[in-house]
Every structure is written in structure tokens, then in C-alpha cells.
């Protein structure tokens, strides 16, 4: 994945997905972290009360990511 692709995905996560997740989970989400390697892409969700969720994503499945996150926090 190029640096540009990483930056675009990370920006989406932080500007679009984080507010959605916080609203869905009543602001219990402390932070989201986007990680990418040659083998996988992962969004790590850290909750304010403790706990972490790792959500695996593929290069073209940000919608699936949003749906998966919403299922996990509801």
C-alpha cells in the first residue's frame, strides 16, 4: 500500500468513522488507530473504560468495517 493510500484511509477513519463509532457507543470510544502492513489492515478501537477491539479490513471494505464496528458496539 502506498503512503497516499494509507493517508486517505486513515483520514476516513479519523474524520468519518470515529464520530460514528462514538455516537453509536455513547462516546465510550477513546480512540481509533489505523494500522497497515503488507499482509493486513486493521483498525484498533480503544474504549475509555478499558478494552480493545481489533477489526480486520481489506483494501476496499471500509463500508464493511463501519458495519462490523457498529455491530460490535451495539
Predicted regions and their residues:
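N-terminal acidic leader/helix
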Residues: 2-35, 56
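Short, charge-rich amphipathic interface segments used for partner binding and complex assembly
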Residues: 28-73
Amino acid at each position: 500500500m502506498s503512503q497516499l493510500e494509507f493517508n486517505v484511509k486513515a483520514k476516513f477513519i479519523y474524520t468519518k468513522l470515529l464520530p460514528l463509532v462514538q455516537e453509536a457507543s455513547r462516546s465510550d470510544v477513546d480512540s481509533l488507530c489505523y494500522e497497515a502492513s503488507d499482509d493486513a489492515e486493521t483498525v484498533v478501537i480503544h474504549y475509555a473504560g478499558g478494552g480493545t477491539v481489533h477489526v480486520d479490513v481489506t483494501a476496499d471494505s471500509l463500508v464493511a468495517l463501519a458495519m462490523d464496528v457498529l455491530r460490535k458496539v451495539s
